[in-house]
C-alpha cells in the first residue's frame, strides 16, 4: 500500500528582496538580559491531592521549627494537603526592588494536583546564591485530575504546574554594564559577517565615521557617551536605525519525526537522476499446540510456523536539470507517492553526491 507523503514545505523568501529591520529587532545590547531565579518551597491547602514523602515531611517539620513548633522525635505528621515544589522566575534587566514578577510553580514529588494550593514564602535565588526575590501567593492551575473508585483516571492539561501572576517581589536588583565603560556592544541574534558590517555602516552613516566597528560575525561595538543620562537617548536613537540584513545561507531543515521540510533561500540542485526503491519484508508467526490423546503416552508440544513475504514496490526514476529548486524536487517526489522517510533518504543521498547546494540540517 502506498504511503502518502504528508509534510509541509515552506519556501523562505523565495525571490523576495530583504527588507530593512530596526536594530532592536535583530540585535541585543550586551549585558542587558533576563536572569533566571529558582527556589524550593511548600504549597499548602491542597484538597487531599498532596504527597507523603520523606522530604515533604522533613520540609514541613523544618518550617514548623522556624515558627517555634517542635514535633516529638520520630513523629511523622500525616499530611495530604502539602506538596514540595520548585519555583522559578525570569528577572528582567533594570527591574527595581519592590517591583513584581510572575512565577511558575512545579511539583517535585508525587502530588496529584496543585489546584487550590497556596505557595508559602519562598526565597528565589540567582546563580550566585543571593536572594533576589521572595514569592508567595495562590496558584492558578489550568489542569485538573480526577480519580474513580475503580481505578479510572481523567487528567486534563498539567495539574502539577501552576503560575502566580505578580507572585514575587523583587528585593535586590542586578547590576548591568549599561552605565559603565566607553562602549556599548550589540550582539546579533543571528550571526552573519555581512549583517554585522551593514549594521556598523548604518550607524556610522548617522553618527559619523568610526563610531561603530564590527568585532566579529556577532558583535558590533559602538562608542557611547560617558554621561549615563545621555546613554538612554543615545541607545533609543541607535535601536531605531534600520539595517537590511544579509541573505541567509542556503539551508534545508528536515524534521524526521513529523516529516516537515523547510527550504531556505538559494537552495539549488545540480543535474542528478534519482530512483528510490522500497523493499518491505513481513514476518508472520503462527503458534500451534499439539495435544496427545489422553490415553496415549505422549507430551504436549508447541511449534511455530513462520511465513515470510518480501515485496518491492515499483519506483520511478526522475531526473533534475541544472538549477532545479527543491520545491520542484518535493513536487516530483510527491507524484510518485513517497513517504517522508523516503524524502529524507533522497535528500541525504543528494547531499553526499554533491548535487544539493545547501546545508542539510536534520532535527
Swiss-Prot record:
The gene is flgI. Assembles around the rod to form the L-ring and probably protects the motor/basal body from shearing forces during rotation. One of its GO terms (cellular component) is bacterial-type flagellum basal body, distal rod, P ring. The basal body constitutes a major portion of the flagellar organelle and consists of four rings (L,P,S, and M) mounted on a central rod. It is found in: Periplasm; Bacterial flagellum basal body. PANTHER family: FLAGELLAR P-RING PERIPLASMIC PROTEIN FLGI, FLAGELLAR P-RING PROTEIN. One of its GO terms (molecular function) is structural molecule activity. Residues 1-20 form the signal peptide. Belongs to the FlgI family. GO terms for biological process: bacterial-type flagellum-dependent cell motility. Keywords: Bacterial flagellum, Periplasm, Signal. It comes from the Bacteria. Coiled coil: none annotated. InterPro entries: Flag_FlgI. This is Flagellar P-ring protein.
